[in-house]
């Protein structure tokens, strides 16, 4: 692999074993990032292609509920920003694969003609109804989509849903005296995913900010001499990060829970790249760690502030460059 073209993702924040990910990026000859914010990954790119955000263009949203929702441009983009589809079209054309569209409706109509289940979900119908769930095969007003995909029976020989059992596989990472606790990465309301968007929202930053939290059981915290809201070090075989303890009876004893979106308290620095043989997903939910209290909390607080400021400065300088 010699190059990477990344759109709307931040693997230098979200992938497991971030030290290995950074090394992989350094070995690439070319890194292109197309995004709306300056992320950690964008700061490591050779070429940055800034694109418009959802409020600066129109299009169609979809989700796991099979729904299509047309959305409209709210404001004109500043500077000479292009939409994702315009950027892709120009690059493809210059690389010898001509792509010429005048608007998003032309792209959507092409998709409709390729997929019979989408064909009836026209731009006009989505604009009138606001929401359509596929299958929607007829362009007439009579076909307003399908609320229940399998209302009476499933698409199986006997009409029943099929369930399959999975064999339990032991975690690859192992607990030891040096790393006696289990880290499981989770998601919570507030800052979502890699935090690129929510981290730029002042209201959400006021609810919770760097370096994030590690939820720890009350008994474990007492044994380790850790108080609620205190800064702590979390170590694994792959690295260490600083974070804030959130002490309660909610976590299981012997386990800590961390969300992976924090920039300073990036728990994916700790997670090992042990891949599932079936899904090829890393062991995000099981990582052997050690939690240590920090005696000098004032110095620790200043360390977090300094690291946060250095990161923001680096991202700003990368954006200006």
Annotate each language-model stretch with its function.
Residues 108-203:
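Long, low-complexity segments enriched in small/aliphatic residues
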Residues 20, 27-30, 35-39, 73-93, ...:
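Phosphate/diphosphate-binding loops
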Residues 1-5, 64-73, 90:
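Short acidic (Asp/Glu) and glycine-rich catalytic loops that position anionic groups and cofactors
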Residues 5-26:
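Glycine-rich, anion-gripping cofactor-binding loops and their flanking helix/strand elements
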Residues 78-80, 84-132, 199-215, 219-321:
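Long, contiguous, secondary-structure-rich segments that constitute the structural scaffold
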Residues 7, 11-14, 54, 61, ...:
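Hydrophobic alpha-helical scaffolding
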Residues 37-72, 262:
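Flexible glycine/proline-rich, aromatic-decorated loop/lid segments
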């Amino acid at each position: 692999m010699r190059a990477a073209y990344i759109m709307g993702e931040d693997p230098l924040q979200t992938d497991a074993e971030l030290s290995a990910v950074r090394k992989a990026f350094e070995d690439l000859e070319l890194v292109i990032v197309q995004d709306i914010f300056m992320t950690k990954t964008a700061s490591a790119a050779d070429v940055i292609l800034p694109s418009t955000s959802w409020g600066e263009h129109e299009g169609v949203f979809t989700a796991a509920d099979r729904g299509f929702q047309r959305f409209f441009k709210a404001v004109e983009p500043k500077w000479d920003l292009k939409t994702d589809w315009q950027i892709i079209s120009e690059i493809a054309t210059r690389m010898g694969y001509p792509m010429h569209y005048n608007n998003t409706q032309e792209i959507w109509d092409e998709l409709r003609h390729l997929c019979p289940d989408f064909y009836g979900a026209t731009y006009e119908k989505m604009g009138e109804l606001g929401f359509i769930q596929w299958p929607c095969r007829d362009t007439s007003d009579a076909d307003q989509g399908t609320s229940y995909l399998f209302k009476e029976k499933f698409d199986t020989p006997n009409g029943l849903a099929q369930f399959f059992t999975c064999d339990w596989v032991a975690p690859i990472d192992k607990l030891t005296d040096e790393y006696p606790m289990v880290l499981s990465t989770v998601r919570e309301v507030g800052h979502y995913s890699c935090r690129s968007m929510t981290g730029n929202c002042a209201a959400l930053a006021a609810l919770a900010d760097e370096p994030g939290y590690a939820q720890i059981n009350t008994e474990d915290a007492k044994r380790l001499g850790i108080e609620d809201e205190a800064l702590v070090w979390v170590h694994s075989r792959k690295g260490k990060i600083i974070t804030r303890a959130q002490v309660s009876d909610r976590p299981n004893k012997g386990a800590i829970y961390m969300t992976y979106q924090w920039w300073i308290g990036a728990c994916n620095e700790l997670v090992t790249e042990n891949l599932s043989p079936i899904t090829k997903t890393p062991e995000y939910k099981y990582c052997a760690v050690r939690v240590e209290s920090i005696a000098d909390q004032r110095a620790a607080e200043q360390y977090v502030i300094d690291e946060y400021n250095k990161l923001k400065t680096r991202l700003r300088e990368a954006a200006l460059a």
